[in-house]
């Protein structure tokens, strides 16, 4: 490979390596484990370097083509000019002249190389301390290498760029690979140090009693959650009475590190850091509030480091979702079991005990009879029998009494069976709630809710069905990392990236959705599972995009309950949409391929999926699928 081509690659690689932010700035941006942070950082680095590599390669190819058109004299003039500008000044940072004179204008290639070096020096100006000294030494080293190469070129009579430059190991990629190795080693060392600190905190925490732990939580909450101006009012100095709970100071010092990094940030980066600090503060305050309200056993579960922390260093999105839905499922199951047990116990005490005054009890008020339809029917039947018995005489009365006792026994058998059930299915109540919210015209067909669509909706859906048939809409499968899943949606020739992050509070589950167009976040929306759809506007090309979070319940093939959830999006302008669904059951998490559909919004803002014939609208739900 030509020496000149190697020189240019070295220059481009140097620019790429030093254009990435200092490693320390990203290390503690997310309040997750060390491994989560490292994984996210490496992902960002990889994307960043790949983009830089593609841009650099495109520039180099363009320069290569221009270079081929030069004659020998022009090439020699280029080498002499480059060497004169780069290698003769004593003070490299001050003496490089970036303005082209008249005789230099033809040598645009020279100036482009120098501009790359100028960008590197501009970045050097923002560095301070040891980092700046290190960068200066690297710049001087690179300068010396380039000057040596230029001296070699003057001695050569002819040189041409070789076609196999991409195969040479000393390319941008080779240099980047070496840089990644150094970064990886740096992060691993940081991770080990952090893990050692976490282990130390864990051991200290185990030695605390309940009273000391409560004092720690109260003081931490008071310092962190009551100040109006978080950046100005946090006091990082410990008073004498605060020195015992050392964890308080350590957590606050960690937050102080965030704020120190914030001071050196600017523009969008600063706004991003401020938002992350506020989010972290809110999460910590929520945890502290939960901790004060829970029992001692729940307190230990909330704050104690998990034993399998070291065994699972790479917690994925699925692990986080699995834990989230597990907690939601447990809470739902516990609440329904308690409610059911109360209803059953009241009814059993009133109607199923061996009492002589059973007939009097039947005639009493129904206020305590509960709300389940099957139980109400039996109670009504018992009352009807009792009314007939009072009016009957002789053999007829005895027959009615016998039938009354048989009905009572069946009724009590139903109660006993209900008491033995582990799960309570409440689909009928949920369906009634949906019907009330969605308005008139909705009917149930099988397991789906169907609604007649207007002529305009039908026409729009048929247009959307044609686009899907013509493959004018494409959606990539979800790619998940950490708490965030990403996909790319392409409609005609317009592309839009979408990513969502799942978050959970004590009362609800949310999907934080962001739309990215041309590398910039165009819109954001928080979607609560179960809420009515909400929309964002992505401009004239893509138009209004509506979103809905859906949650459903079902059973796996083994009979165990599972939770299904979907994020549905609808491009209103094109009448096409897509559902991204997942399920958690049997301690397994599964993501399904995206499902595209043609649809529209009704007058209530609800997203309807067009039926196969395009005449009816089907209410979106969480798909039922099994995990074995």
From Swiss-Prot:
This protein's GO CC annotations: extracellular region
Protein keywords: Disulfide bond, Secreted, Signal, Toxin
Chain intervals for the UniProt region annotation (Disordered): 290-313
Domain of life (superkingdom): Eukaryota
Mod. after translation: Contains 5 disulfide bonds.
Signal peptide: 1-19
GO molecular function: toxin activity
Ranges annotated as biased composition (Acidic residues): 291-313
Propeptide cleavage-removed residue intervals: 20-368
Compartments, as annotated in UniProt: Secreted
Principal subcellular localization: secreted
Expression sites by tissue: Expressed by the venom gland (posterior main gland) (at protein level).
Keyword Signal (UniProt): yes
Function in brief: Highly abundant protein that may be responsible for the observed disruption of sensory neuron membranes, since it is homologous to proteins such as trialysin, which forms pores in lipid bilayers. Probable insecticidal toxin.
Family that this chain belongs to: Belongs to the redulysin-like family.
Protein name: Venom redulysin 1
Annotated organism of origin: Platymeris rhadamanthus (Red spot assassin bug)
């Amino acid at each position: 490979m030509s020496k000149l081509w190697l020189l240019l690659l070295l220059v481009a690689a140097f620019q790429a390596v030093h254009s990435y932010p200092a490693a320390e700035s990203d290390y503690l941006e997310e309040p997750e484990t060390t491994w989560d942070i490292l994984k996210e950082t490496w992902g960002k680095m990889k994307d960043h370097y790949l983009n830089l590599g593609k841009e650099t390669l495109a520039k180099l190819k363009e320069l290569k083509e221009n270079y081929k058109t030069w004659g020998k004299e022009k090439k020699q003039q280029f080498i002499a000019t480059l060497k004169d500008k780069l290698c003769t000044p004593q003070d490299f940072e001050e003496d490089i002249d970036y303005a082209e004179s008249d005789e230099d204008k033809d040598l645009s290639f020279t100036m482009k190389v120098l501009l790359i070096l100028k960008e590197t020096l501009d970045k050097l100006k923002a560095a301070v301390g040891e980092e700046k000294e290190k960068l200066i030494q690297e710049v001087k080293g690179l300068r010396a290498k380039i000057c040596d190469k230029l001296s070699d070129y003057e001695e050569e009579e002819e040189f041409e760029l070789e076609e196999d430059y991409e195969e040479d190991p000393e390319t941008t990629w080779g240099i980047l690979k070496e840089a990644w190795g150094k970064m990886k080693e740096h992060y691993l060392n940081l991770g080990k140090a952090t893990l050692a600190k976490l282990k130390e905190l864990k051991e200290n925490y185990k030695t605390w009693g309940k009273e000391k732990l409560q004092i720690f939580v109260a003081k931490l909450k008071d310092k962190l959650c009551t100040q109006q101006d978080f950046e100005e009012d946090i006091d990082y100095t410990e008073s004498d009475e605060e020195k015992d709970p050392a964890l308080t100071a350590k957590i606050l010092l960690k937050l102080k590190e965030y704020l120190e990094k914030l001071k050196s940030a600017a523009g969008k980066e600063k706004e991003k850091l401020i938002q992350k600090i506020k989010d972290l503060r809110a999460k910590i305050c929520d945890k502290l509030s939960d901790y004060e309200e829970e029992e001692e056993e729940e307190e230990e579960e909330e704050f104690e480091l998990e034993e399998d922390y070291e065994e699972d260093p790479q917690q994925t999105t699925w692990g986080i979702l699995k834990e989230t839905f597990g907690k939601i499922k447990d809470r739902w199951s516990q609440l329904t079991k308690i409610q059911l047990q109360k209803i059953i116990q009241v009814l059993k005490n009133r109607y199923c005990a061996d009492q002589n005054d059973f007939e009097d009890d039947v005639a009493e008020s129904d206020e305590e009879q509960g709300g389940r339809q099957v139980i109400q029917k039996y109670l009504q039947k018992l009352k009807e029998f009792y009314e007939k018995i009072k009016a009957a005489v002789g053999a007829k009365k005895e027959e009615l009494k016998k039938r009354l006792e048989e009905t009572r026994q069946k009724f009590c058998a139903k109660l006993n069976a209900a008491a033995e059930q582990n799960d309570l299915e409440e689909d009928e109540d949920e369906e009634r709630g949906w019907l009330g919210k969605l308005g008139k015209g909705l009917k149930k067909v099988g397991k789906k809710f169907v609604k007649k669509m207007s002529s305009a909706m039908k026409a729009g859906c048929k247009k959307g069905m044609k686009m899907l048939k013509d493959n004018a809409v494409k959606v990539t499968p979800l790619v998940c990392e950490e708490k965030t899943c990403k996909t790319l949606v392409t409609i005609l020739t317009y592309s839009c990236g979408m990513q969502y992050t799942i978050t959970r509070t004590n009362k609800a589950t949310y999907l934080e959705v962001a739309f990215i167009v041309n590398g910039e976040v165009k819109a954001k929306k928080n979607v609560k599972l179960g809420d009515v759809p909400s929309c964002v506007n992505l401009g004239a090309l893509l138009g209004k995009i509506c979103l809905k979070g859906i949650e459903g319940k079902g059973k796996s093939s083994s009979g165990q309950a599972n939770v299904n959830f979907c994020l549905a999006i609808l491009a209103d302008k094109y009448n096409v949409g897509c559902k991204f669904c997942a399920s958690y059951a049997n301690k397994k998490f599964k993501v399904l391929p995206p499902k595209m559909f043609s649809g529209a919004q009704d007058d209530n803002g609800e997203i309807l999926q067009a039926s196969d014939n395009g005449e009816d609208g089907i209410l979106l739900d969480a798909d039922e699928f099994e995990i074995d």
